[in-house]
């Protein structure tokens, strides 16, 4: 099944809802970064949240999420675009812990329970929107829920989950965001709160084959959900050799001459997708000649 995202309204507009399957996206991130199980879950949950938060934007808008906890994986950084392109990395991918007795990955131990979630939105204004909230659990779903409440004053429920196989490959990943709109009735809020207590983990629902629409129907009741739009989501990095060449050219002639004199081969590493671009002395010489 391919990855995709659903935007919906529920209860006659009282609830805005997003749901997404990100199994392939998280698998691609795991492959590129060689993340171990707990790091995969942390990165995958963050990518999933990023995909849904990106879908709240329009046109060419984009956002960056930084989860900076005091755990051993270090900062997690996600870039998400309104068109469904998402990329991201975790600073230390080789982090894993023993699962709990219930088989749950200890994501909070990897992320840490102190620190901040920062969201930077480039929405075409002169200055970006920057929102920040403290990490409350390190499990990420609760941390993004708290972010929406504190920074965007939007009562929300964020569920994100990743199931990882014994060989570190990704079995299932996805999530949902429910947002209560102004004027929502108490009955609606109570209904959702009760449903959220009863549903299985979102990653389990995806493993069992539920679609993003199926997840929203499971939580909100099929008769209450009105799907507005579906869109593809994918791990897609904007880096390329041409872009790296432009960055090198921007260093100027003197610095490029110095690099060429000191290095047999220059390597530039993209943190987001782990791609490495190599430039020989002749490559650098050709770049200098364009200046």
Curated annotation (Swiss-Prot):
PTM characteristics: Under oxidizing conditions two disulfide bonds are formed involving the reactive cysteines. Under reducing conditions zinc is bound to the reactive cysteines and the protein is inactive.
Family: Belongs to the HSP33 family.
Record keywords: Chaperone, Cytoplasm, Disulfide bond, Redox-active center, Zinc
Compartment annotation: Cytoplasm
Function: Redox regulated molecular chaperone. Protects both thermally unfolding and oxidatively damaged proteins from irreversible aggregation. Plays an important role in the bacterial defense system toward oxidative stress.
BP term (GO), one: protein refolding
Cytoplasm listed as a keyword: yes
Alphabetical list of CDD domains matching this protein: Hsp33
UniProt name for this protein: 33 kDa chaperonin
Highest taxon in the source lineage: Bacteria
Disulfide bond annotation, renumbered to this chain: 237-239, 270-273
Example of a GO MF term: unfolded protein binding
Presence of the UniProt keyword Metal-binding in the record: no
Main subcellular localisation: cytoplasm
Gene responsible for this protein: hslO
Gene Ontology cellular component list: cytoplasm
């Amino acid at each position: 099944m391919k990855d995709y995202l659903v935007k919906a309204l529920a209860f006659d507009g009282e609830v805005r809802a997003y749901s997404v399957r990100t199994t392939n996206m998280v698998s691609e991130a795991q492959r590129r970064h060689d993340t171990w199980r707990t790091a995969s879950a942390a990165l995958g949950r963050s990518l999933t949240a990023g995909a849904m938060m990106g879908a709240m934007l329009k046109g060419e808008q984009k956002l960056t999420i930084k989860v900076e906890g005091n755990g051993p994986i270090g900062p997690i950084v996600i870039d998400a675009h309104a068109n469904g392109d998402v990329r991201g990395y975790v600073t230390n991918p080789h982090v894993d812990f023993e699962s709990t007795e219930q088989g749950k990955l200890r994501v909070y131990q990897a992320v840490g329970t102190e620190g901040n979630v920062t969201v930077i939105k480039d929405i075409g204004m002169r200055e970006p929107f920057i929102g920040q909230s403290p990490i409350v659990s390190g499990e990420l779903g609760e941390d993004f829920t708290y972010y929406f409440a504190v920074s965007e004053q939007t009562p929300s429920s964020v569920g994100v989950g990743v199931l990882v196989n014994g060989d570190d490959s990704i079995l299932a990943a996805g999530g949902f965001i429910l947002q209560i709109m102004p004027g929502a009735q108490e009955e609606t809020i109570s209904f959702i709160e009760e449903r959220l207590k009863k549903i299985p983990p979102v990653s389990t629902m995806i493993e069992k084959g539920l679609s993003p629409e199926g997840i929203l129907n499971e939580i909100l009741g099929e008769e209450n959900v009105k799907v507005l739009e579906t869109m593809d989501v994918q791990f897609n990095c904007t880096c390329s050799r041409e872009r790296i060449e432009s960055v090198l050219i921007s260093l100027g002639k003197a610095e490029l001459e110095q690099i060429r004199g000191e290095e047999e081969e220059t390597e530039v590493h993209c943190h987001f997708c782990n791609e490495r671009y190599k430039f020989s002395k002749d490559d650098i010489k050709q770049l200098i000649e364009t200046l």
